[in-house]
Amino acid sequence: MVAIITEKFKLHNAEQFTESFSESSASTYYMFIGKSTEFSGDRDGTGATDTTPPTPLDSVSDEFYFFDQMIAAKKIASSDVINCIPRRDWSNSTTFDMYRDNYSSLNTTDSGASSLYSSTFYFRTSANRVYKVISNIPTGANTAAAAFSGSEPTTEGTSLFTIGGYVLKYMYTISASNATKFLTTDFMPVETDSTVSAAATDGAVESLRVTNVGTGLTNGTYYAAIEGDGSNAGTSSGAIARIVISSNQIQAFGTDASTTSGIHAAGSGYTFGTINLSSGNTFSDNTLTTAAAVGGTGGAIDVIISPKGGHGSNAVKELGAHFVIVNTTFSGAESDDILAGNDFRNVGIVVDPTNFGSSTVATASTVRQTYALKFASVSGTFTPDEKITQASTSAIGKVVEFDS
């Protein structure tokens, strides 16, 4: 039996996790630190050291060890969590992938990726603006991708626009606070721009791809109804494609109505669509009343179906943000719960921990996971990680901190 963990399922899990921090019956998460002593490798036989720490193991015994080694923990706020995607930075002369609805292992992207969400179909600029690549095919009678060639984009409008030979969609700008907190060398946070999302139309056809430019076609601008399952599909009230033929070949998709093929009317409700260029299906006017054959031979255009909700409706879903960044900062001793005089080697997250000796879920902003001993009198001093033994019971403990 063949099975697949879909992108939608991964995204659902990530969204459920982030939502669990702020929903009405929210879970309580703490980030913990632990293990003040060096890695010795004695327990698992790996020979691990602080220089070459061991790979964490997913076992019952290791879970108990992690609890036993905990030193302190800090509550994770909902503002400490965000969905994220692999970081892709804009750079001129770089070939980015373009958005398409049908990538697979049998139909890979220009970079060789077998899925949309593992491709390079979006990028971030130096001003933290994030754009989706709608087309990477330059204008003219072209069907192949090319490198971006132009200045860094700055547009923040809701319409598609052309720059550097690419057709782009502005998605959102990473806020200064989120950039400081969540932007890393490998990942970048995802936000939703309310203006962009409000302008999106579910099932609108927003892009095309010329797969065969044809030969000997009659120059001019033509219009064709986009067939499919959209509202009023196949009629002048549905989605309509604009086909520009120059030098007897179909021009690539773009946003310039006079020189590029594109979308005259986007329509709505499409989950599949086709364009028929045969005689009787193309027209010289955008009301589709005067038939005009394109002539020649060949010529083919694919309809690219937009994501559910339309481009820009939901950046988290559209960009495949099934990764999550958690950023909680330990700052000093924090109410004397966080150690300041020793080191640690384990970092992790625990959900709904209870207060010691009860079944009540902890709510304090910081908690300590160590016992405290107060001596009536002390001779000498203790050192971090020193092993101490109680003479009467032979109980053994390790010193994490000592305050004289």
Map each language-model feature to its residues:
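Tryptophan-rich substrate-binding surfaces of secreted polymer-degrading and adhesive proteins
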Residues: 1-201, 302-304, 352, 361-362, ...
